[in-house]
């Protein structure tokens, strides 16, 4: 198992970057409204995709992004990825990764999880959140396949899921993992000061007891950053048979690495590519902050001395694209797309 603690010193301590090949596309942005499977209410998603035209700087929910808003999709066939953000978070906190992957030929649909986002935390600590988040990602996969703008340009292969923090838990459930709620209770007895995992003292609110963890056979690979995974032992992970790329920081003050990413990497039945970043904390995976964000959320912007967030993000963009290209098939340039070709049968 690749459990070597990859210190990635060049990335973390400001070593020189290898020249990056110029991205062949610009990142497009498409706004999507879906139906939340939990309560049948509208839910939002942002789709980043390889686009034609020119990108422009815009600001969405306080995050500056460079995109071509609702521009035509570039001609070709592209793998589909779905991004799941952390508890009370925003997919825009990972905009650098979504736009970077779009420029390299991936369609990235970033769900805003209802009841567990920066504006609305009402489902935090509930069963409807734990089991509803994967259902929302599955709904996003179906919606993307059926979307008039995106659908004709998606390849026929499996789908990748990117999960950050609690989004890692979501990705694992979609891959076949079965959460063990007793593990959460036991963990919170041992470490009651873990304010993030133990907000409800290890007992989730059974607001929707009829819900259950549901895997999605369309998922073919996962990329996890600082994953929340303490509810998964070996037995709970036995059905997870997809390739995984896992990143974590060894200075994560929010999620205990030994009980989350490190334990997960040991227990997955398919050996993951596990990369431990020296000195990095939980928030190193979030987009670099501008002056306004530094003033508003300093704790999320600041890294330990010697940790270079820009270099880490460059590595994430490059290596995530390579990982999904190998696992799902590489993006394909094309003079025409499925929109002008013969009808095909896609995985919906």
Q: What positions do the PLM features span?
A:
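Short alpha-helix in the alpha/beta-hydrolase fold that links the catalytic acid
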Residues: 242, 256-267, 289
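Catalytic active-site module of serine/aspartate enzymes centered on a nucleophile-bearing elbow/loop
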Residues: 291-348
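Short beta-strand/loop motif that positions the catalytic acidic residue
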Residues: 240, 246-248
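Short substrate-entry loop that stabilizes the transition state in hydrolases
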Residues: 54-55, 66-78, 83-120, 253-257
